[in-house]
Amino acid sequence: MSKEDKEKTQIIDKDLDLSNAGRGVWLVKVPKYIAQKWEKAPTNMDVGKLRINKTPGQKAQVSLSLTPAVLALDPEEKIPTEHILDVSQVTKQTLGVFSHMAPSDGKENSTTSAAQPDNEKLYMEGRIVQKLECRPIADNCYMKLKLESIRKASEPQRRVQPIDKIVQNFKPVKDHAHNIEYRERKKAEGKKARDDKNAVMDMLFHAFEKHQYYNIKDLVKITNQPISYLKEILKDVCDYNMKNPHKNMWELKKEYRHYKTEEKKEEEHKSGSSDSE
């Protein structure tokens, strides 16, 4: 609730009729099929008979029998007739049953009651002293009802339904856009032709002047040569690294390198490490 709604809300003090506050009331929980029957029943119909059998030194046995009039509301629906009520005392809670009554003697009174909520009367019908849970007797009728409820619960929500006509969610096309784009790109690139070996080697030497290590994909882009033909030339002038940190990369063979200073440092480092050992 927003701040504006709280400001608009009016707190009205009303009198509560407590004349029946001392009356004990039972709170009964019934199965869903009984509640549905009772909702369909008219107000003046007897919906059931309650029997209380009291035995000295034992708990009272309470049973409920539905009347034939209630069962006749929907004859096709077979439900159990006899039920047992399990009784439990309410000791650590204070629960009450309340009702309200607003005057509804025509349209004028209904409008005045809406405009003047003070006309509404509140009653306390009693204090809940016992809770009862209604459960059916396990007879054949109840077993059939239970099996039917289990069957309905196990039915899948989605069902496979055969259709007698074709349902097209998309229009068929001769070719897809990404396939056409791929073929056009391949045509634009053209077929890679083999250049002269010396010309390819010149391109490789020029590339290795910029970087010491290359992977095969970059060299294919630089030379624009078929990968099989390029590998043949690389085997003549380059070494393929099989170990980290430059694994799966190509570098020029020692006889073709121009960075002698770096090689000397590496050799000095290797010789220094061998002397220390």
From Swiss-Prot:
<keyword id="KW-0805">Transcription regulation</keyword>
<dbReference type="GO" id="GO:0006367">
    <property type="term" value="P:transcription initiation at RNA polymerase II promoter"/>
</dbReference>
<dbReference type="InterPro" id="IPR011039">
    <property type="entry name" value="TFIIF_interaction"/>
</dbReference>
<dbReference type="GO" id="GO:0003677">
    <property type="term" value="F:DNA binding"/>
</dbReference>
<dbReference type="GO" id="GO:0006368">
    <property type="term" value="P:transcription elongation by RNA polymerase II"/>
</dbReference>
<comment type="similarity">
    <text>Belongs to the TFIIF beta subunit family.</text>
</comment>
<keyword id="KW-0804">Transcription</keyword>
<dbReference type="InterPro" id="IPR036388">
    <property type="entry name" value="WH-like_DNA-bd_sf"/>
</dbReference>
<dbReference type="GO" id="GO:0001096">
    <property type="term" value="F:TFIIF-class transcription factor complex binding"/>
</dbReference>
<dbReference type="Pfam" id="PF17683">
    <property type="entry name" value="TFIIF_beta_N"/>
</dbReference>
<dbReference type="InterPro" id="IPR036390">
    <property type="entry name" value="WH_DNA-bd_sf"/>
</dbReference>
<comment type="function">
    <text>TFIIF is a general transcription initiation factor that binds to RNA polymerase II and helps to recruit it to the initiation complex in collaboration with TFIIB.</text>
</comment>
<dbReference type="GO" id="GO:0005634">
    <property type="term" value="C:nucleus"/>
</dbReference>
<dbReference type="InterPro" id="IPR040504">
    <property type="entry name" value="TFIIF_beta_N"/>
</dbReference>
<keyword id="KW-0238">DNA-binding</keyword>
<dbReference type="GO" id="GO:0005674">
    <property type="term" value="C:transcription factor TFIIF complex"/>
</dbReference>
<keyword id="KW-0539">Nucleus</keyword>
<dbReference type="GO" id="GO:0006366">
    <property type="term" value="P:transcription by RNA polymerase II"/>
</dbReference>
<protein>
    <recommendedName>
        <fullName>General transcription factor IIF subunit 2</fullName>
    </recommendedName>
</protein>
<dbReference type="Pfam" id="PF02270">
    <property type="entry name" value="TFIIF_beta"/>
</dbReference>
<comment type="subunit">
    <text>Heterodimer of an alpha and a beta subunit.</text>
</comment>
<dbReference type="InterPro" id="IPR003196">
    <property type="entry name" value="TFIIF_beta"/>
</dbReference>
<dbReference type="InterPro" id="IPR040450">
    <property type="entry name" value="TFIIF_beta_HTH"/>
</dbReference>
